[in-house]
Amino acid sequence: EDDLSDFNPKV
């Protein structure tokens, strides 16, 4: 999920 750092709607 580190790669999803660019796409984190949960944040």
From Swiss-Prot:
The lineage of its organism: Eukaryota, Metazoa, Ecdysozoa, Arthropoda, Hexapoda. Expressed by the venom gland. Belongs to the SA81-like family. It comes from Isodontia harmandi (Grass-carrying wasp). It is found in: Secreted. The keyword Manganese does not apply. Negative results: does not show activity on voltage-gated sodium channels, potassium channels, and calcium channels. All the following channels have been tested at 10 uM: Kv1.1/KCNA1, Kv1.2/KCNA2, Kv1.3/KCNA3, Kv1.4/KCNA4, Kv1.5/KCNA5, Kv1.6/KCNA6, Kv2.1/KCNB1, Kv3.1/KCNC1, Kv4.2/KCND2, Kv4.3/KCND3, Shaker IR, and Kv11.1/KCNH2/ERG1, as well as Nav1.2/SCN2A, Nav1.4/SCN4A, Nav1.5/SCN5A, Nav1.6/SCN8A, Nav1.8/SCN10A, and DmNav1, and the nicotinic acetylcholine receptor alpha-7 (CHRNA7). This is Venom peptide Sh42. GO terms for cellular component: extracellular region. Keywords: Secreted. It comes from the Eukaryota.
